[in-house]
Amino acid sequence: MSQLYASLFYQNEVTEIFSDRALVSYMIEAEVALAQAQAQVGVIPESAAIAISNIAATAIDQIDFDVLAVATGLAGNIAIPFVKQLTAIVKQSDEDAARYVHWGATSQDILDTACILQCRAAMTHVEALIQQCYRTALTQAEQYRSQVMIGRDRKSVV
């Protein structure tokens, strides 16, 4: 985030949605959804999906973001080192379930899904801001509908 423009262009709620922690949370959410969907159709054992879901609920607090940042630079994307950390976290509690973390998915699948989840969450805030702008503009247009005024920009009359 640009500190120079922070007070002009950023909304704290939206900025938080695009934080590193939020991205990893959405990646965890994608991995959980993948495991649950695969269990529903018999691709992985239901017990593995349940274990992955339960363990993932607190996994964000166990992710080492410093290690993840360095490994992301070495790997070329966040997904590969993320999956290694998530798998290790699941393995601490359920070695069998750890085998099914990220089963059949590509790194890009998880990263793309997480990014779309971020965008969806941000759009909730953006839509509310657009509605607020619309209501304000409508109020101003109604209030000053009969007011004659010249057009202008910051420095000159148009």
Regions found by a protein language model. Give the residues of each.
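A helix-coil-helix interface module used to build multimeric assemblies
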Residues: 1-156
